[in-house]
Amino acid sequence: MNWDTPIDLAAAGSPSALSHQSLRDNIELVEQLLRQVAAQEGGGDLVELLDRLWASHQDRTGEGLALIRELSLEKSVLAIRAFSIYFQLINIVEQHHERKRLRLQASFSADTAQPGSFCWLFDEMKSLGVSTPEIERVLQQLDVRLVFTAHPTEIVRRTIRTKHRRIVHLLDDLDNALSEWQQQQVHTTMLEEIRIWWRTDELHQVRPTVLDEVAHTVHYFEEVLFEAMPRVRSELVRCLDMFHPSLTRSLGTFCRFGSWVGSDRDGNPSVNALVTWKTACHQRSRVLAKYIKSVERLRDLLSLAEGNPPQDLLLALEQDQRDLGEVYERYSVVYLQEPYRLKLSYILERLEHTRERNAWLEVHGPQRLSQPDEPGWLHYYRHAHELLAELHLLRQCLRTTGIGCRPLETLIDQVEVFGFHLAGLDVRQDSTRHEDTLTEVSAKLRLTATPYAELDEQARLEWLVRELQTLRPLIPAELPFSARTEETIQTFRMIRRLQKEFGSEICHTYIISMSKQASDLLEVLLLAEEAGLFDPATGTGTLMVVPLFETVEDLRNAPHVLEQLFSLPLYRCYLTCHQNLQEVMLGYSDSNKDSGFLSSSWEIFLAQQHIQQVARRHGVQLRIFHGRGGTVGRGGGPSYQAILAQPDGTVSGRIKITEQGEVLASKYSLFELAAFNIETVTAAVIQASVLPTSPPGSRNWELRLQELSDVARRTYRQLVYEQEGFIDFFCHVTPIDEISQLQISSRPSRREGRRDLASLRAIPWVFSWTQSRFLLQAWYGLGTALDGFIRCNRERNLAELRSMYRQWPFFRTLISKVEMTLAKVDLQVAANYVQELLPKEHEHTGECIFALIAAELERTRECVLAITEHRQLLEDNPPLQRSIALRNATIAPLGYLQATLLKYLRYENRQPRSYSRNELLRGALLTINGIAAGMRNTG
């Protein structure tokens, strides 16, 4: 369960099966077990210390802070470990409870279906009179894409994640225990597991490599998604059969997966052509291993003795015998009367050949292979479609004999979704890399009188179009260029080699981060043409070029950029290679860091509207790629509500969303949670494509939002970019420097290693404010905007805001996110960071900045309460309200411990006794882990 989407016990509809008591019992159990472990590992005085710390922070007395200041480093670390494991255990119990609820919900009728489920959606649309043809139209173009990323603040070690899964399985065992003895056995095993966990280092000892991150991400596909996707499809088919039985024929492959892990090179020098090649080979090896196991199980199952098998199967077996005679010799006698088993043996052999070839390719890399070096396997699968054709043949032959086979249907579903690639790799690179590459190439070959980088935009466009239409190659086979330029060129050549060997699905998308102008896309098209990925002469191309607009200025300019591109005949030729579809990515993180939460949210909303208008005017299909993070400050929050809050007409059955590494465990670590997450995202896309998301007459509200956004942006930038001493304040009162020392990501936390706000990545920016409990990025500026508007005419303007909140999904979602964030802010803890960590020379400036933040927080809180008509934050969601209140009180000791350890670490003269820097750093890093577990998010 994600803290942002709490368990609603009442929603389960069964007061007996899933009561508060079952959740409470498991929480009490893990608390008791942790107390036992703490006593065993730290003695009775540690348990007493933990009780005192917890009690003192429930009522917010000063005793807790005084106690922390007296603790030795050794005792501090023990307390930190206990609180950190406690939060992780609570998270596990809540996640387990949510899984039980979803299992129970699956057995209910449409009357009690979970909101956001397929059953609930189709029942709702039936009551609203939505016609079958309208739903069919959406289903025919339904295209949901979920893209996994490696998160620079994915703080939990894979070793610890494995322990989490084991404890979940033990909770399952406890549910199934029938006797006291069985329950006691589970308790004993769980106690042992927690004790081993206590002695396991929670900190990464070495920075993970990119391929380590690849293996970590692929785990979710292997262990969960491979089985979850067929379940989601079968649930959609089941619900369509209930409400629109004729539409199951309209259902294609509606959900696919992508990944940036191993292919996102923006700001990560560790990702190069060879790494991306190895990533593709690793993904293929894992998906082939899954298929081989599935086919082996099918061969065990399909023991049908057929003296007269279907003619199509006989013809296929005769061809197989000619191609793979050794398989026939091995199995023809054993499976003499079992043609399905014999056919599956041929399929297994081809899969094994495919796997062997893949292993060979992984070793030899992406360089162009000469013919004599090619492996001698003739009978491997060149594409997943070949395997699918054989599986479809088996299904058809079985149907002619009146036999159905669910495992075969499941395997077909899996091959249709995951192919031989598992997840498509999106390559991402900063726009300046392509500019630098063409500048160097054109200078080396003397193609421009003026250096390319010095050309204005119009001159660039003219030169790029001319070069794209020139038949001669631009770049020589041998690369006499700098290492950076050579790597950029090799990336495109590697993509071409990947597509040739694996099919275009493996690497079909090239994202240009920090896109600002039309030439940014044409530069990539030119480099793609040089690698054989685009040919304007024949109108063929296999690489989709995707601009990523990130700052507010770039979001505002995006419609103009697309207008320019769509007006170019050469670019329209490129679009025909992709069924006239343009994908556009919008960045939530950098726009938020640039302009604050309200302005970022609103500018992304506007950009979608204006981009859609440009696309419609030019007859271009549009797919918007939402670069959402895991936290509110980076566009996070419940996906269902977020999709329904998009502007009318911008979804149209298609959406692409990033799933950040930090939320993968909460969404995809358990089968039921993964299946339901995919189901709700898909249901939301269907709903947003069929039903209007903006109320009639909302145009005036959009004008109002623009006014509020402008004020909020000015207020935010006055603090973050214009307030004297703010950067020093940020560096002092957050653990930003210590976060950069966590060995948790292959990617640096800053671009190019600079130490200014512009170079700091949005993710550690959010992570730092979350740790010190300000959560500044998710609300600052909103209060001034709302308060100023309300004060102009309180009765009229507040009534307007309340109407917007009740009737406009976008505004309601925005305010709800802020309300939840405000509940998480703990200004008392934040004030302690200021008190403990500001140097004397910064005290006056820092106190002024803190006063600005505190005043804005109070303004924001009062305005949100007035708009929602709540007396307290989250008054309409008691489970979430209670959960956050409890977590706030329990996280507080970790915040005080962190500030104290940071003080000792940074200021040697403030240490009560002499500690080594490494000891203090380790303690501080452990608090970062603990707070992240308690807050349930990082960046």
Swiss-Prot record:
Keywords: Carbon dioxide fixation, Lyase, Magnesium. The active site is at residues 151, 593. GO terms for biological process: carbon fixation; oxaloacetate metabolic process; tricarboxylic acid cycle. It catalyses: oxaloacetate + phosphate = phosphoenolpyruvate + hydrogencarbonate. Its cofactor is Mg(2+). It comes from the Bacteria. Pfam families: PEPcase. Its EC number is 4.1.1.31. Gene3D superfamilies: Phosphoenolpyruvate/pyruvate domain (1.20.1440.90). GO terms for cellular component: cytosol. Coiled coil: none annotated. GO terms for molecular function: magnesium ion binding; phosphoenolpyruvate carboxylase activity. Belongs to the PEPCase type 1 family. Forms oxaloacetate, a four-carbon dicarboxylic acid source for the tricarboxylic acid cycle. NCBIfam families: PRK00009.1 (NF000584). This is Phosphoenolpyruvate carboxylase.
